[in-house]
């Protein structure tokens, strides 16, 4: 509606409104980042974790990583939780596409090359992990000892790079939240991109689900009724065998539901 549009314009990125309300208004430059970052941190708080990590796969020029830093600062203040940020990138742009599954009709090697020195000077808390994700994820947990991974922002474009990034999940599930908030950039596109479940990030997601019994990506269902152009890019990674997966997290909401169904 026009009223909703005006509200978004008036309050966009406002420092005087809580981040949660800005997300509900869709009044943010990168609402999909804010949604995953904020609600993953809120889940962590409900599970009594005092520190979490965000990961961005495919940093490119670095605008998303810088935005994530700003989000983290607000979330740390609003929710009283510590946040670490890690950004994975080759530093040299996209690698050469490996067959049709990497969508060579739309992407080519060398695109989105990073100016590493320039970005290093701009970031404040993020750690850049430079190299082919096929190799850099292997020792990530031993080399960096990150706090539990709460949210992952995946913009690797290719099937091959995306499926290689999923090797991160070969680690113990206790390194993650029991349910990880995930954003996939290249699952909703244009008539030229023509993304499908037979290539790109969607194929990687399907293959992961087919080969893993105890961890599954699931497209969100809670945003589907909303008019959001990013709603089909939000997935949840369920780790069913996580020690905290079955922990009851929201008694206040259940109290409200119980009261609402009471006989009058």
Give the location of each predicted region:
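S-adenosylmethionine/decaboxylated-SAM
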Residues: 10, 15-27, 47-264
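Conserved alpha-helix/loop element of class I SAM-dependent methyltransferases that forms part
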Residues: 34-50
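Conserved SAM-binding loop and adjacent beta-strand
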Residues: 25-36
């Amino acid at each position: 509606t026009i009223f909703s549009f005006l509200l978004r314009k008036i309050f966009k990125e406002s420092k005087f409104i809580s981040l949660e309300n800005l997300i509900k208004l869709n009044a943010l430059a990168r609402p999909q980042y804010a949604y995953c970052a904020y609600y993953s941190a809120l889940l962590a708080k409900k599970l009594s974790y005092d520190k979490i990590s965000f990961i961005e796969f495919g940093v490119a020029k670095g605008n998303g990583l810088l935005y994530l830093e700003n989000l983290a600062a607000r979330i740390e203040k609003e929710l009283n939780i510590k946040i670490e940020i890690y950004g994975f990138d080759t530093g040299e742009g996209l690698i050469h596409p490996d067959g049709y599954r990497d969508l060579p009709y739309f992407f080519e090697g060398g695109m989105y090359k990073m100016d590493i020195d320039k970005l290093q000077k701009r970031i404040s808390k993020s750690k850049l992990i430079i190299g082919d994700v096929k190799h850099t994820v292997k020792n990530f947990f031993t080399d960096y000892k990150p706090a539990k991974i709460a949210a992952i922002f995946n913009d690797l474009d290719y099937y091959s790079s995306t499926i290689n990034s999923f090797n991160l999940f070969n680690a113990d599930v206790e390194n993650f939240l029991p349910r990880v908030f995930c954003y996939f950039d290249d699952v909703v596109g244009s008539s030229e991109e023509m993304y499908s479940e037979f290539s790109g990030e969607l194929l990687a997601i399907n293959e992961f689900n087919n080969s893993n019994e105890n961890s599954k990506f699931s497209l969100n269902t809670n945003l589907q009724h909303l008019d959001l152009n990013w709603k089909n890019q939000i997935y949840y990674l369920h780790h069913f065998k996580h020690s905290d997966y079955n922990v009851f997290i929201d008694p206040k909401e259940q109290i409200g539901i119980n009261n609402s169904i009471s006989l009058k």
